[in-house]
A protein has these predicted regions:
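Short intrinsically disordered, low-complexity coil segments enriched in acidic
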Residues: 1-20, 150, 170, 179
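Structural motif
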Residues: 7-15, 53-60, 90-101, 135-144
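Repeated scaffold domains used in trafficking and secretory/extracellular systems
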Residues: 32-41, 70-79, 113-123, 158-171, ...
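Residue position within the beta-strands of beta-propeller blades
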Residues: 1-3, 45-49, 82-86, 127-131, ...
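Intrinsically disordered, low-complexity segments enriched in Gly and acidic/Ser/Thr residues
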Residues: 70-74, 85-98, 111-122, 127-139
Length: 179
């Protein structure tokens, strides 16, 4: 349940009525002035909050912060792990930007930077396009495969990644916007 009010005092509650019994909503977060929210297949409440006009967001799961400065418009959830891109806009010149990150049990692991697009095939295989170039009528980059902890270059001048099999929750918090 998401409640919104004119004074910016929005709240998120969990209310599970699947067993048919009467229950009381449980507050998850009471400081969600600007948020985007969705539910995973295993009923985790995933939402994001922006901090004072920043283009990036902090991502929360069931009221717990799992990542700061992340792109909440493209999150994948598979077998208890979240996959997302961090630091797209880069606030520090020394820090890598657009870092594909896996969050498993609250621990973040950086996979590769300069990632524009990615697709989680399964927990051990991720395709990603890095180093996107935008020139004339061409928008493409280098395709890599992250397989069993190693990164392998596949091809260059790749424009998109397509998959026909959905084995995970694709979370687009922009699509499920509740602002």
């Amino acid at each position: 349940i998401f409640t919104a009010s004119g004074d910016g005092d929005s709240k998120i509650y969990r209310l599970d009525l699947s067993d048919g019994s009467d229950k009381t909503p449980v507050a998850i977060d009471d400081d969600t002035n600007v948020t985007r929210i969705t539910l995973t297949g295993d009923k985790k409440v995933v939402y994001s909050k922006t901090e004072y006009g920043s283009p990036m967001r902090n991502i929360y799961v069931d009221g717990k912060l799992i990542s700061e400065n992340a792109d909440s418009d493209n999150i994948t959830y598979l077998d208890g792990s979240f996959y997302y891109i961090k630091n797209t806009y880069g606030t520090d010149e020394e820090e890598p930007t657009s870092v594909l990150t896996i969050n498993q049990d609250g621990k973040e692991t950086a996979i590769k930077d300069d990632v524009s697009r990615y697709c989680v095939l399964d927990k051990d295989n991720i395709t990603m396009i890095c180093g996107m170039k935008y020139k004339d009528d061409f928008h493409g980059g280098t395709l890599y495969l992250y397989k069993d902890g190693k990164i392998v270059k596949i091809d260059e001048e790749v424009t998109s990644i397509e998959t026909a099999v959905k084995r995970y929750d694709k979370i687009d918090l922009n699509y499920y916007s509740m602002q």
